[in-house]
Amino acid sequence: MPLLPVALLVVLLCLPAAPHAAAAEDDPTPTPWPPQFHAKLLMDYHGNLSLADLWYDWPRGRNLHVIRYQLAADAPYYDAEWNNGTSFFYTPARRTCRSAAVGVGILRPDWLVPGSVYLGRRDAGGFDCHVWAKADFITYYEDVRTKRPVKWVFYTGRIAYVMSFEVGAVLEDAEWQAPEYCFTKDGGLPDPDLSRGHDESFIPRSVL
């Protein structure tokens, strides 16, 4: 059930800016993420709706998405990512879990700055936003006044609307621990419905 991250777009950090993408001197620069934050997201993936809590903790090298799909009896679904390149995807209600060694860590706070292309100012639901695109992977909307993220549009068609953004919020350490069945020999039960509403928007890709 791969989703956001979380390691998210890390491979993009290594991409140099193309010559045509060099920002003009008067173009604004994306605001780096704060080292720690909590964002509530409304996700729309081709009509499949979900709510997500995104916990970003750069100092501790971890990123967590807690996702609740519309009217899902087995919510929530967890996507925990670590800076050592390990991710865990699990649904406690089903006791399902799988892990992935993606080989890269979580996004750096300034992940959007190198290689992004400024697209200008646009309205996003009543918010006046600066807009950047990066590597045909994401279009990023940032509020001009507050410099906080407003909307993310991924290459898969997934749209994340940022409903709240708490700078400095930190989740308790116990909430980051993957359940014990993630570490058993079979890694938990196989999930019969891995594809429901998921895409790879938040999973780093080796080739872009």
Regions found by a protein language model. Name each.
Residues 31-42, 59-66, 124-133, 145-151:
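Short, hydrophobic/aromatic-rich segments at coil-to-beta transitions
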Residues 125-188:
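Gly/Pro-enriched, hydrophobic low-complexity segments
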Residues 50-110, 138-140, 149-164:
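An acidic-aromatic
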Residues 2-62, 94-95, 174-208:
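N-terminal leader/targeting segments and the immediate start of mature chains
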Residues 40-46, 68, 135, 155, ...:
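A structural detector for beta-sheet-dominated domains
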Residues 47-49, 113-115, 125, 133-135:
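Short solvent-exposed loop/turn micro-motifs enriched in small/polar/acidic residues
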Residues 105-123, 164-165, 170:
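Short acidic, Pro/Gly- and aromatic-enriched capping/linker segments at domain boundaries
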Residues 90-92, 122, 175:
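Residue-level signal for mature regions of secreted extracellular proteins and peptides
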